[in-house]
Amino acid sequence: MEWKYIKKLKSIDLIDDFECLVKYVFCDEFRECVIANNGGRPSKKIFDTDKVKERVLKSFLSFNKEDRETVWKIFDWNKEELANKYVPFGIDNFGNLICFNANNDKIVFVNHEDMSVEAIAENFNGFMSKLYE
């Protein structure tokens, strides 16, 4: 898969710091993806949920605090709704979030307006394998 607009990760410690903030430990596959493609946009960006076909991933969120769309800003803006339930890592063009379910590591789509949730995949690898063009 090709990636565009990657923002070089300033420090691996940023991933650890975010994990401490949200009280969630990312899987190794996700950490490796962030290290290689922080804040990037994959060429395969379309995915289906259990309710809607052809949703579009705009980009992964950056772990660098000074970047425009970051896990830090998104979590801060939505912490009341997301706290202890969902950990954001991606965003679509409308501000909806792609998140880890903090209770079972499944990947979900969270509508930012009403916080409704749609299932995407059993885990991060499953999510990546479901992306298409």
Residue spans of the language-model regions?
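Alpha-helix C-terminal capping segments
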Residues: M1, F100, L131-Y132
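A surface-exposed partner-binding patch
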Residues: M1-N96
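Papain-like cysteine protease catalytic domains, especially those used for deubiquitination
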Residues: F63-N64, D114, E118
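Short, solvent-exposed coil/turn segments at beta-strand boundaries
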Residues: K85, A102-D105
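Short, flexible loop/turn elements at secondary-structure junctions
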Residues: N93, E113-D114
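Broad, structure-driven detector of short, well-ordered beta-strand segments within folded domains
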Residues: N96-A102
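Short, compact, well-ordered microdomains
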Residues: I107-V110
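Compact, glycine/acidic-enriched structural inserts
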Residues: V117-E133
